C-alpha cells in the first residue's frame, strides 16, 4: 500500500479495515523535508481485529520527514501510526549541519597561510615583498549528532607586505586576498561545495631579543551548494551565500641556535558567520544561526634554515 502523507498539516491517506485482517503488509510513505510539530504522530492503518502485521516498506524501514526519521509503530490496538524516531536525524539534517561546520575549517586553512608567512619572515631583513601560498588539506569530521563528512580543500593566498626596522625592533604590515574551494562528501550520502573569497590585513612586531606579537584580521564570502541524499535514495539540493569574519592574535618568543630556531607561542582566534535561511528542494527549511568560535592555542614551532645552491632558502 502507498500512502500520501503530509505530517506538517496532519493529513494522510488512511487504510481502514472494518473486519478481521490477516497477513503481512507493507506501507510505503513518500519522504519529505517539511517538518511537523515535535512529537507528532499520524494513524495510517486501523483494522477490526486479526493477526495482520503492517510495517514500513521504505528502505531501512524508515521515512524522512523533516528533521527526524519516522517509523511505523504498532499501537497494540489493531492500529499503526507513523511516529518519529528521535534517536536518528535524517540524512538531509546531517548534511545541513555539516555545511555549517565546514566554514570554520575553511577560515582556519586560509588563516594558516598568513600565520606561516608571519613566521617565515621573523629575523629576515627586507623592504617590500610579494608572496603566495597554496592550500591543499583534507579534514575528516565526526559529531555526536550522527553527522560526519570528509572535506578536501584547495586554494591560493596572495599577499604583499613591508618591513620597517628600528634600532631594537621591527614591524611588518601586509595585505592579502585569496580563494579556496572545498569538496565535501557526507558520511550518509550526498555532497557539498564551498567557494570562499577572502580579504584581510596583518601586522607583526618583533624585538631583537626574540619576543614578538602578530595579528591578523580577515573577512570571507562563502558560496555554498548542497546535494543531500535522502533515505529513499532521492537527492535534495539547495544553495546559499554567507559571510564570515575573524581575527587572530599570537605572542611568543623566538630562540635561534645556529640554523635551528624554536618558537613557543600562545594564540587566540575568533571567528563568526552571519545566520542564513534557505530551503532544500525536498521542502526542508534550514534556519542556520550564527557560528561563533573562540579558541585558545599554545604550541611550539621548530624550524631549520637551509640555503640551497641555486639561491633558494628553505625553512621546514
List where the protein language model places each region:
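Membrane translocator/pore-forming domains, dominated by Gram-negative outer-membrane beta-barrels
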Residues: 4-6, 73-76, 89-97, 124-129, ...
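Interface/linker segment at the passenger-translocator junction
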Residues: 4-5, 40-48, 54-151
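Short alpha-helical segments and helix-capping/turn motifs at coil-helix boundaries
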Residues: 12-14, 113-118, 157-160
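Generic preference for hydrophobic/aromatic residues in regular secondary structure cores
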Residues: 15, 27-28, 45, 54-56, ...
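A broad "ordered helical/assembly scaffold" signature
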Residues: 25-30, 48, 54-56, 195, ...
Amino acid at each position: 500500500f502507498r500512502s500520501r502523507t503530509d505530517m506538517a498539516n496532519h493529513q494522510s491517506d488512511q487504510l481502514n479495515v472494518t473486519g478481521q485482517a490477516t497477513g503481512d503488509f507493507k506501507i510505503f510513505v513518500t519522504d519529505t523535508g517539511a517538518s511537523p510539530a515535535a512529537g507528532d504522530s499520524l494513524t495510517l492503518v486501523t483494522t477490526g481485529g486479526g493477526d495482520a502485521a503492517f510495517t514500513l516498506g521504505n528502505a531501512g524501514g524508515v521515512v524522512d520527514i523533516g528533521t527526524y526519521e519516522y517509523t511505523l509503530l504498532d499501537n497494540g490496538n489493531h492500529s499503526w501510526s507513523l511516529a518519529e524516531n528521535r534517536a536518528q536525524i535524517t540524512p538531509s539534517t546531517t548534511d545541513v549541519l555539516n555545511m555549517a561546520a565546514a566554514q570554520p575549517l575553511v577560515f582556519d586553512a586560509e588563516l594558516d597561510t598568513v600565520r606561516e608567512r608571519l613566521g617565515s619572515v621573523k629575523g629576515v631583513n627586507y623592504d617590500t615583498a610579494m608572496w603566495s601560498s597554496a592550500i591543499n588539506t583534507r579534514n575528516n569530521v565526526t559529531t555526536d549528532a550522527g553527522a560526519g563528512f570528509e572535506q578536501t580543500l584547495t586554494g591560493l593566498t596572495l599577499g604583499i607586505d613591508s618591513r620597517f626596522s628600528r634600532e631594537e625592533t621591527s614591524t611588518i604590515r601586509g595585505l592579502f586576498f585569496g580563494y579556496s574551494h572545498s569538496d565535501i562528501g557526507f558520511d550518509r550520502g550526498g555532497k557539498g561545495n564551498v567557494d570562499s573569497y577572502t580579504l584581510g590585513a596583518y601586522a607583526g612586531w618583533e624585538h631583537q631579543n626574540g619576543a614578538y606579537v602578530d595579528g591578523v584580521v580577515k573577512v570571507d564570502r562563502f558560496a555554498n551548494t548542497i546535494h543531500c541524499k535522502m533515505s529513499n535514495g532521492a537527492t535534495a539540493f539547495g544553495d546559499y551565500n554567507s559571510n564570515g569574519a575573524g581575527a587572530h592574535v599570537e605572542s611568543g618568543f623566538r630562540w635561534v641556535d645556529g640554523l635551528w630556531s624554536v618558537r613557543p607561542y600562545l594564540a587566540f582566534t575568533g571567528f563568526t558567520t552571519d545566520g542564513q535561511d534557505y530551503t532544500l528542494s525536498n521542502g526542508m527549511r534550514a534556519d542556520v544561526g550564527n557560528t561563533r568560535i573562540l579558541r585558545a592555542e599554545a604550541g611550539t614551532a621548530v624550524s631549520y634554515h637551509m640555503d640551497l645552491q641555486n639561491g633558494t632558502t628553505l625553512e621546514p
